[in-house]
Structure formats: C-alpha cells, structure tokens
C-alpha cells in the first residue's frame, strides 16, 4: 500500500510494515479503575441541570484540539461546563442528557475510544495513541465517570437520527456536533447560562480543590520572592517561569496567563508579555494562580517592592489599596449584595483620589460619577472556580445583582494604576501600579480568606520578603 505524506522521510508504508505493526501487542485494559472522587458530585450537578430542562435533550461538548501553527496544537483544555457535569477532561467528548418519557433524563457520555490495532490509525494518525499517549477505553471511562460511554465517532449521526427531540447544545465548542442538531440560538444560550448558574455555589469537593489551588499559589509566590535578585539580571520572564514551575509541579498549569508586571508595566491591567526589566526600586505586580489537575484555579495578586522595602510614595499608594481591600472584604457575608464589596472598595479609593487632588470631589459625588475609574480601571472582583472569571454566563440577577450565599467563591482585588503618560498626576506618581487580590469563600457566618497565607499589609509584605528573598 502507499500512504504518501508531504515532506515525510517515510513517504510510503509497505504492506509488510503495516502487518508487522498490527501484531504482538499486549492487552492493557485496566480493570482496577475506581470512580473518580468527584463522580458523585457530578451526578448531583447533572440532576440539577436535568430539573431545569424537562423533556429536552441537552448536549454539552468538551471541545476539540485547536491548531497553534501548522501541525502543532495548543494544550487541550475542556469546556468548563463539561468538566463540571462529568469530571472528565478528555477532548472530543460530549455529555448528552436524553429525556425520559416519565420525566428526568438518562445521561451518557460520548468519548474518543482507544485506537484499534486492526488498522494503521493507531500509529500513523495525526493524533495516534502511539504518538500522543494512551487514551482510556470506553469501559475504563465508564468505570471512572460512572456514566455509560459511547463512541464519539457516531455521535453526529446518532444525534441527527433522532431529530424530533427538542434539543439544546452549547454552541461554539464542537462544530461537528453543532451541525448535527437543529436548535435555536436563544434557547441554546439559556443552556449555557444554566451551566454557569449551577457553578455559583461550590460543593464541598470543589472548595477542597480551590484550597489546593490557593495553597500551591502561595508557595509559588514565595518561590518568586526567592528569585527576585536573579530576575534583576534577567527579566520578568524569569519570574513568570519560576511561578510556572510550581504550577506544573503541583497542579495542571497556570489557570490563566500570568501577569508579571514590573515598573510601569504594573499599571497595565493585563500585562502578559512579561518581557520587561526588573529594576531595584520599582514595584512588581504579580497576578497568578495555580490550576489544579482537576482544573480549579486560584487567582491571587500581590504587589512587591523589588528592593524589599517600599518607598514612602509607594507605601502611600499601597496603603490606600490595602485599606480599600479591607473595606471590601469586610462586607463579604451571606445575604450581602454581591456588589457590596465592590462599592465599599471603590468608595474608599474615590475618597483617597479626591484627598490627593486627582479627581474633583466631594468623594461620594466622584464615586457616583465613576471618576475614580480613571485610576482604578476594572471592577473589584469576580467569581472563581473552574474558570478564573467563573460563572461568566450566569444570569445577571443571580450573579452581579444577586446576594452572596455560603459556598460562593470570589476575589476581592482593588487597585490603583497611575499610567506613565498620565499628565493629571505629579511626575513621581506616574508608573506606579498596585493591586492586592485575595480569594474568599462565603461561609455560614461570614467568609474565609483562602489566600490568608500570603501577607497583605505593607509591613507584613516587607517582613515576608526579608525572610524569603534570595
């Protein structure tokens, strides 16, 4: 046979080699696999989703590989709604909730099965197991997920064959599955909204994963402090790499693009180039989070004096942000409006900016007009979980306009950013950026700061750096 590949050093495949490759392989089926730790929690989440859409078929894909360049792909990351509902992270999968005539749904999962040794695909395919690693068999997946599993290669035909069932699918994740079903865009959006709604309150297992993520992140920040002196001779990249090493060692990776911003880069909200110099006397704003192997992420920010101590002006700005964060954190408790922490922090920053003469007062009027936003830029926090900006599609009345409940996890992250080219502030203020961010869980009687292991006040930061700086 001939199987020509452009510019391959092996442009042909002989029948003899093909026959040789198909024989002599051991049976590696694993019969010792137990259900995943999160499987019973995922079953409860599916039941909650089922209750929202009686009589309708629901399709939640995991997603496909995305090309980085040529034949190189990005590391795969499953759609968070799929992970939440299944505990699975495999590519090319899909959860289907099939409505039962008597109510409720039957759940099953489409998976990409193992490559057969009866043809050449297992070693010649673009993503063949012999090249990229062993996948789980369908039987293995059933044992791990606690769900019936089917071959995803028949999914499009299966779904298209039962076209009379009213169906919703999460759009933009798997084009082939999306093309196989006839759905309504507005109704599909409601499914995605519901998947976000159901992540607003974390269960006990999720909170445990978030604690792991934050604890690893605390260790990663300590690693960075120990490498500051080396980074002065290199760049922000050295510190980004230092944190990434911890993330890979203890978790899956980083949960989002690390912001490692020294000097005036600290005034750029989402600086991820991380290629600038690290200079003594400047501040380093590090916004980073470890993502666990279950894909839950931390999101923590500290602003550090590279020399180990704040200058008087740096400390003045830092203290203003710290006090604003304290005001925001104090509001986090069950029954409080979600917006309370944001409003408390922003009111404090507006008052300080009026006091400094950078915006026109009185402070309450400045806040009501949003004048502080020239220097605060973003909102003061967000939900946290499988995504760094978790529950982004949740209904507004349940999220931003909702009230806090035990089990919710959110960040509180006020900041002040005086751009290097901002002529409305004195020259010595320009290029100073400060943000402090912590991860909080709402408890029955208040809140728990998961990231309390990292110092926050200026004095605490300086003492911590003196202890760990290399």
From Swiss-Prot:
Any Pfam family: AMP_N
Amino-acid positions noted as binding Mn(2+) 1 in the UniProt annotation, renumbered to this chain: 299, 382, 413, 437
Top EC category: hydrolase
Superkingdom, taxonomy of origin: Bacteria
SUPFAM superfamilies xrefs: Creatinase/aminopeptidase, Creatinase/prolidase N-terminal domain
Subunit (UniProt): Homodimer.
EC number: 3.4.11.9
This protein's name: Xaa-Pro aminopeptidase 2
Necessary cofactors: Mn(2+)
Cofactor: how bound: Binds 2 manganese ions per subunit.
Similarity comment: family membership: Belongs to the peptidase M24B family.
GO cellular component, one term: cytosol
Keywords: Aminopeptidase, Hydrolase, Manganese, Metal-binding, Metalloprotease, Protease
């Amino acid at each position: 046979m001939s199987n020509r590949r452009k510019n391959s050093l092996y442009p042909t495949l002989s029948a003899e080699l093909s026959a040789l490759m198909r024989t002599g392989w051991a049976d590696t089926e694993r019969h010792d696999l137990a259900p995943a730790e999160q499987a019973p929690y995922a079953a409860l989440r599916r039941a909650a989703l089922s209750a929202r859409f009686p009589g309708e078929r629901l399709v939640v894909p995991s997603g496909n590989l995305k090309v980085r360049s040529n034949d190189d792909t990005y590391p795969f990351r499953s759609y968070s709604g799929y992970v939440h509902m299944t505990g699975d992270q495999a590519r090319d999968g899909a959860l289907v909730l099939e409505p039962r005539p008597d109510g409720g749904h039957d759940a099953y999962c489409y998976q990409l099965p193992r490559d057969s040794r009866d043809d050449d695909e297992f070693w010649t395919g673009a993503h063949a197991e012999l090249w990229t690693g062993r996948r789980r068999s369908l039987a293995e997946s059933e044992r791990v997920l606690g769900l019936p599993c089917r071959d995803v290669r028949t999914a499009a035909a299966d779904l298209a064959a039962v076209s009379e069932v009213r169906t919703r699918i999460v759009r933009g994740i798997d084009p082939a599955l999306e093309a196989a079903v006839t759905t309504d865009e507005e109704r599909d959006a409601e499914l995605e909204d519901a998947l976000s709604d159901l992540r607003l309150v974390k269960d006990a297992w999720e909170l445990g994963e978030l604690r792991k993520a934050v604890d690893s992140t605390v260790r990663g920040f300590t690693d960075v402090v120990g490498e500051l002196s080396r980074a002065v001779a290199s760049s922000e990249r050295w510190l980004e790499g230092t944190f990434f090493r911890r993330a890979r060692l203890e978790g899956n990776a980083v949960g989002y693009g690390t912001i490692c911003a020294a000097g005036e880069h600290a005034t750029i909200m989402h600086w991820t180039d991380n290629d600038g110099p690290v200079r003594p006397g400047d501040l380093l704003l590090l916004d980073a989070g470890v993502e666990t192997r279950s894909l839950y992420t931390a999101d923590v920010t500290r602003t550090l004096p590279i020399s180990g101590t704040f200058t008087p002006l740096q400390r003045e700005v830092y203290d203003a942000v710290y006090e604003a964060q304290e005001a925001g954190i104090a509001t986090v408790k069950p029954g409080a409006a979600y917006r309370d922490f944001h409003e408390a922090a922003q009111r404090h920053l507006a008052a300080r900016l009026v006091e400094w003469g950078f915006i026109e007062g009185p402070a309450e009027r400045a806040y009501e007009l949003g004048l502080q936003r020239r220097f605060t830029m973003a909102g003061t926090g967000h939900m946290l979980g499988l995504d760094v900006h978790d529950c982004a599609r949740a209904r507004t009345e349940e999220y931003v306009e909702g009230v806090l409940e035990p089990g919710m996890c959110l960040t509180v992250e006020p900041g002040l950013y005086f751009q290097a080219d901002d002529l409305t502030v004195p020259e010595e203020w320009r290029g100073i950026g400060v943000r402090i961010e912590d991860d909080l869980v709402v408890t029955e009687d208040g809140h728990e700061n998961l990231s309390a292991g990292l110092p926050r006040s200026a004095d605490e930061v300086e003492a911590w750096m003196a202890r760990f700086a290399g």
